[in-house]
């Protein structure tokens, strides 16, 4: 998925030169993510999670291959990219609750934060590798990188094929414990909604995620920052994406040393507060070296906050509700990503990408302070071993 997002973002931005092109892509993705995520959580608690993951990954393989064929014949159009991105956003989000809920089945509770961190590290290793795959296959290393992205599309198709078969190598059963198929799907959905709303911690975590991400989403928008902040092209996109992922790996490794800290909600708040200050640094500087430093630190802070949020969701939710609880978490995150992608891309056309990040940093700090004092459940949460 990382490689697809880089390829399509660069393809769209090079075709139009407008941040709004990526902004509308974010809204299209958001429109399909909401229902897909909600029902993905319900089905993750009813169906075999391994099969559900493989089913959703098949769409990635098929549709990325479809774009590769169109690009090979110079027939790929903007509406094709929008349509395929919408479908793949829906299927990817539909499978997210199954992936998240499955994690808690294969590891003991006392090392769950380690497992979530390793998932994040695996994801970020891919995020490091894929920019360099893009760098090579898009010929960004040439003085004038204007070649077709057809090779990038085909390599992405090959990688997607392996994602279809990989879930079946996991030996643990994919079925949820205490599964209740007798209840209707809509009743399952309502039951999950009521559980999340009444939870003492989860609403605060979700509001925090939404409040910060809506004003600061920068991933998938590196073509804009590369051009506006550093006057660079594909090479800078690959560099910025990779170093942000390196930072995320450092952050995920740091999480492994926090397993003895009981007040995990405080870790989330501090990590998000640091994230806000780093956004200001990233937006303020036009030096790519300072930008790289800021992105490494941003990746680390974001990874700590994200991993701990996911861990708290898993620790405070019974297995037969995890699919729906993680779906609610994904809904908050993915919805914020879509709106944030639109907001940041549009604002970058009007006030500049740097000013947009500075504004986002100040708003993020304000959101953390509001959650700290107004929704104290997050701050007061302390993990207790069974």
Description of each model-found segment:
Residues 101, 105, 147-149, 153-183, ...:
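Helix-loop junctions on the cytosolic side of multi-pass membrane transporters
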Residues 23-28, 35-39, 46, 50-52, ...:
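C-terminal transmembrane bundle of multi-pass solute transporters/carriers
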Residues 76-84, 204-205, 289-295:
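Short hydrophobic/alpha-helical segments at membrane-entry points of transmembrane helices
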Residues 85-125:
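Cytoplasmic helix-loop-helix junction between adjacent transmembrane helices
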Residues 9-15, 68-73, 129-155, 228-229, ...:
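Transmembrane alpha-helix termini and helix-breaking/packing motifs in multi-pass membrane transporters
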Residues 8, 94-107, 304-317:
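Intracellular juxtamembrane helix-capping segments at the cytosolic ends
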Residues 172-207:
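Juxtamembrane intracellular "pre-TM" segments in multi-pass secondary transporters
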Residues 1-11, 86, 197-217, 296:
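Pair of pore-lining "gating" transmembrane helices in MFS-fold secondary transporters
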């Amino acid at each position: 998925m990382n490689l697809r997002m880089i390829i399509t973002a660069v393809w769209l931005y090079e075709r139009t030169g407008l941040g709004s092109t990526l902004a509308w892509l974010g809204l299209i993705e958001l429109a399909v993510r909401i229902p897909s995520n909600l029902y993905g959580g319900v089905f993750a608690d009813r169906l075999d999670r391994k099969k559900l993951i493989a089913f959703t990954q098949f769409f990635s393989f098929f549709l990325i291959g479809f774009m590769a064929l169109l690009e090979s014949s110079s027939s790929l159009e903007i509406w094709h990219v929008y349509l395929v991105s919408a479908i793949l956003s829906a299927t990817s989000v539909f499978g997210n609750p199954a992936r998240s809920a499955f994690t808690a089945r294969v590891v003991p509770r006392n090392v769950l934060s380690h497992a979530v961190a390793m998932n994040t590290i695996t994801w970020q290793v891919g995020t490091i590798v894929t920019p360099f795959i893009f760098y090579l296959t898009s010929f960004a290393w040439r003085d004038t990188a204007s070649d077709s992205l057809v090779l990038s599309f085909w390599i992405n198709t090959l990688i997607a094929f392996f994602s279809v078969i990989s879930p079946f190598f996991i030996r643990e059963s994919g079925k949820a414990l205490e599964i209740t198929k007798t209840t209707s799907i809509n009743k399952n959905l309502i039951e999950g909604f009521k559980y999340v709303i009444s939870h003492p911690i989860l609403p605060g975590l979700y509001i925090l995620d939404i409040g910060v991400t809506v004003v600061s989403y920068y991933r998938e928008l590196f073509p804009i920052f590369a051009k506006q902040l550093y006057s660079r092209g594909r090479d800078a996109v690959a560099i910025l994406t990779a170093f942000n992922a390196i930072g995320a790996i450092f952050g995920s490794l740091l999480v492994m040393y926090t397993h003895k800290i009981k007040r995990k909600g405080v870790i989330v708040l501090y990590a998000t507060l640091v994230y806000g200050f780093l956004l200001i640094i990233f937006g303020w500087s036009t030096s790519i070296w300072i930008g790289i430093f800021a992105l490494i630190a941003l990746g680390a802070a974001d990874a700590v906050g994200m991993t701990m949020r996911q861990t708290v969701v898993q620790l405070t939710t019974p297995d037969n509700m995890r699919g729906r609880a993680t779906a609610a978490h994904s809904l908050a995150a993915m919805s914020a990503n879509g709106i944030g992608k639109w907001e940041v891309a549009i604002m970058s056309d009007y006030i500049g990408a740097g000013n947009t990040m500075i504004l986002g940093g100040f708003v993020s700090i304000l959101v953390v302070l509001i959650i700290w004092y107004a929704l104290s459940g997050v701050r007061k949460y302390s993990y207790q071993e069974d």
